[in-house]
Amino acid sequence: ANRHYFEQKVKDEVEYAAKSDSVLNVLMFDIDNFKGFNDTYGHISGDKLLALFSNIILQCIRKSDIPVRYGGEEFVVLIRDLDIIIAKSVGDRIRRQLEKQRIYLKQYDERQKVTVSCGVAQFPVHSKNIKEVIEKADQALYYAKSIGKNIVVIYDEIDMPREALERSRQEA
């Protein structure tokens, strides 16, 4: 769905969260090394990868969750009414599903591993301003990429070493 649809959905979900004294999780995904993949294997393969990732997201979320292609190789999923640790585990399930796929590239007769990084923030916990929550999810995503990619990071976990994040992931 496009940006206008996304902005309307964000507005609706924020109103719902405020009225129902609930939370809204923002999961921001970015396919790791997408530009390199696109440059190496071509735009048709890049488009297939984006479509595959969209389908993986849809398989891993609830009907009430809202997935949006945010731009380029970035996707956002809005998840209402869930504890942030559970929302993180949804992000991790999506991450693992993509990692398990080996993208078949017919012209090269090879399968390519592709990974994704994810940042998570929550309204109204991280901010009562949804634009700031989205920015914080983006900051967590940026941190995930900076520590080696292929990991999900909650905004509160920024600055935690990767080893500690991986330990907490295994315990979940």
Language-model features: locations:
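Conserved long alpha-helical elements within nucleotide-processing catalytic cores of c-di-GMP signaling
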Residues: N2-N25, K35-Q59, V68-G72, V76-V77, ...
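Extracytoplasmic/periplasmic beta-strand context in beta-sandwich domains
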Residues: H4, V116, N150-I151
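Active-site core of bacterial EAL-family cyclic-dinucleotide phosphodiesterase domains
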Residues: L27, S168-A172
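GGDEF/GGEEF active-site signature
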Residues: L52-E132, Y143, I154, E171-A172
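Catalytic/regulatory signature loops of cyclic-dinucleotide turnover enzymes
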Residues: K136-P161, E171
